[in-house]
Structures are given as C-alpha cells and as structure tokens.
Amino acid sequence: MCERSLYRAGYVGSLLNLQSPDSFYFSNLRPNGGQLAALPPISYPRGALPWATTPASCAPAQPAGATAFGSFSQPYLAGSGPLGLQPLGAKDRPEEQAKFYTPDVAAGPEERGRSRPPFAPESSLVPGTAGLKSTKYDYAGVGRAAPGSAALLEGTPCAAGFKDDAKGPLNLNMTVQAAGVASCLRPSLPDGLPWGAAPGRARKKRKPYTKQQIAELENEFLLNEFINRQKRKELSNRLNLSDQQVKIWFQNRRMKKKRVVLREQALALY
C-alpha cells in the first residue's frame, strides 16, 4: 500500500499559512480567461509541483513497450511476423504458442518482392473457346446435314422441299407455312377415309334403334329383365340386330329402371 506522507510540501505549507503555488498560477488571470497587461505572465508547469509528482513506489508498473496517451502506436505490417495468441508473460513457452502467419511471411523476402504475373488462360483452353465461339455463330453449318440423315430425308415426299431450302442462304426470320408442315407431319391417308381417322382404327358409325325395334325390346323387357343367350339370339335375328346390341340395350334398360326407382324412393322420403 502507498501512504501519502503528512510532511509533503503542500500539506506543510497550508499549516504554516503560506500561499499556495496555485495562487501564483491563477493570480494574473481575469475571470474571463485573459491575462492582465500590467502583470508579467508566470508559467508554473503542473508537472513541477511537488504534490503532482507521484513517488516511484506508488506509480504502477508499465511494460517497456507501452506507449503514453496521445502517442501513435506502431502501424501493422502484414509481413512483420507471426502473431501470438498468448499474453506477454507467456514468452517462456514459445513452442506452445499458437501462431497465425500471413501469406507473405511463409515466403522468403526475395519471393515477396517479386511481382506476381497476371492470370493468363492456358493455351490448351484457348483453341477450345475459339471452337465454341465459331460453332455458336456459324449459321452456315445449319444447312449441312450428316450423310445418314440425308439418306433418311430422301425417302420422305416432303424432304425434297427441305433440301431445296437448305441449299439456299438460311434466313432466321422466315416463317414456315402451317399447311405444308401439317402435311409432312401427319401420315398420308388412303383415299376415301375421313381426315383424322387412322387406317387400322376404323370405327363403325352409330346406328340408332328404330321405333319398332325399341317396342319389341320393351315388350321383352316387361316379360323378363334378364334374358338368356337363346332368347337374345332370337331377338337379334328377328329385329336385325347383333347379339352385342341386344345385350347392351338390356343392360342400359336395367340401369335406367334402377335410377327411376331410386328417384321415387328419394321423393317418397320428403
């Protein structure tokens, strides 16, 4: 502990009714801060006052590398050396000290002084990029086709028109006629078939039942809702209908009767 002595100059001077050095320092100053012209200026530095000095025993110990307030610290240099994570007192264990090295520290001083050459692409990549650029903008190569594809185009009837167009200069803004494209895309149909009907998927046109056929079928349905194969064959021969038509008509008639019964039951509940 540091104890201030009672025999210091400032304390003894106050007991003996002596003027304090502050009076010499502030006596020639006006209240507004200006000095009187009649009195000479007295410079009494604060550092020379006896009570302003602190004994060495009371002063805190400062490290040798510490700087005073207001002074500038050393600027950071990227290649100055490794930075340690341990405090200053841990210099006795340099092998355990974790260090961070900047990229310039690992290299030698002569290597750091050399200027790095600018990046240049490899020569092997340059021809590839040139080839890509040439193929990207080479519109004249669109008209040229492979030998195999040319042989395939010769067999189709509309391939001749494409080959004639490919011989001339290629126009990117040209519009192809829709009729010509549709004629080449859809297969050629034989004469006599309607447009849109496939050759092997021909479907019979629906033939409605006549009033006489419907009356005969209704009379048979009133007698028996389910008919056997023999009765169905007799009806088909008599009404000039196929066996499948008679079978489907009875199925549809039973479903119609079922819907009517369900509707009547629903109305009876309300």
From Swiss-Prot:
Q: Does the keyword Oxidoreductase apply?
A: no
Annotated spans, Disordered: 103-127
Drop me one GO molecular function for this one.
Answer: DNA-binding transcription factor activity, RNA polymerase II-specific
Q: According to its UniProt entry, what is the function of this protein?
A: Sequence-specific transcription factor which is part of a developmental regulatory system that provides cells with specific positional identities on the anterior-posterior axis.
- Could you read off the lineage of the organism from its UniProt record? Eukaryota, Metazoa, Chordata, Craniata, Vertebrata
Cross-referenced InterPro entries, in alphabetical order? HD (IPR001356), HD_metazoa (IPR020479), Homeobox_CS (IPR017970), Homeodomain-like_sf (IPR009057)
Q: Which CDD domains match?
A: homeodomain
Highest taxon listed in the record's lineage: Eukaryota
Q: Does the keyword Transcription regulation apply?
A: yes
GO CC, sorted alphabetically, is: nucleus
What are the record keywords, sorted?
Developmental protein, DNA-binding, Homeobox, Nucleus, Transcription, Transcription regulation
Where DNA binds (residue ranges)? Answer: 202-261
Q: What is this protein called?
A: Homeobox protein Hox-D12
Localization annotation: Nucleus
Cysteines joined through disulfide linkages:
none
Which family does the UniProt entry place this protein in? Answer: Belongs to the Abd-B homeobox family.
